[in-house]
């Protein structure tokens, strides 16, 4: 037990959707491991919201076990979504459907970030008839290719997974 005050951290429903639920056996093993060895990985937090480590946080607060917090600095919610997707895509227990969903969400978040960054640099840019930034300024294929290279998919597969998001 420790005498430090436990920080009140929040979860976010949108961020929670990005995390595939764990099996009961995993939860039991994680709790036992933290109880025996302490919390070895920090809880990643952005603006008081847990991005990674919500299960660790829950276990540590339940048993009054010390844990570290890593404060993440993101300019936007989309960058926080991108971080969560990257962390979750490292998991080996993801279902195929969840992996598609995460790739789609990552693609959308990175597209939104690219559009926001472009509009900050070029505030007078006219939008196309759909109210979007033209492909000649922010190319979907470029962003999809970067994601595809990172996770071993073709760019067309990444853009296709946008429908799952």
Regions found by a protein language model. Give the residues of each.
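Alpha-helical interaction elements
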Residues: 92-165
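Short, charged/polar connector segments at secondary-structure boundaries
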Residues: 1-72, 86-93
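Generic hydrophobic, aliphatic-rich segments that mediate packing or membrane embedding
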Residues: 55-56, 81, 99, 103
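Acidic/polar active-site rim loop that often engages polyanionic ligands
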Residues: 78-87
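A general alpha-helix detector
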Residues: 14, 84, 143-146
């Amino acid at each position: 037990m420790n005498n430090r005050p436990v920080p009140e951290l929040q979860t976010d429903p949108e961020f929670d959707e990005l995390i595939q639920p764990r099996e009961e056996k995993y939860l039991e093993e994680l709790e036992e491991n933290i109880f025996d060895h302490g919390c070895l990985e920090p809880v990643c937090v952005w603006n008081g919201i847990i991005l990674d480590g919500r299960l660790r946080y829950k276990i540590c607060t339940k048993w009054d076990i010390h844990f570290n917090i890593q404060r993440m600095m993101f300019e936007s919610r989309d960058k926080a979504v991108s971080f969560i997707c990257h962390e979750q895509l490292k998991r080996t227990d993801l279902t195929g459907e969840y992996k598609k969903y995460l790739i789609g969400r990552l693609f959308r978040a990175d597209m939104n970030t690219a559009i926001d960054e472009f509009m900050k640099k070029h505030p007078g840019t006219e939008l196309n008839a759909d109210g979007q930034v033209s492909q000649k300024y922010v190319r979907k294929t470029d962003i999809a290719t970067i994601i595809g290279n990172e996770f071993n998919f073709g760019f067309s597969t990444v853009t296709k997974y946008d429908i799952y998001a």
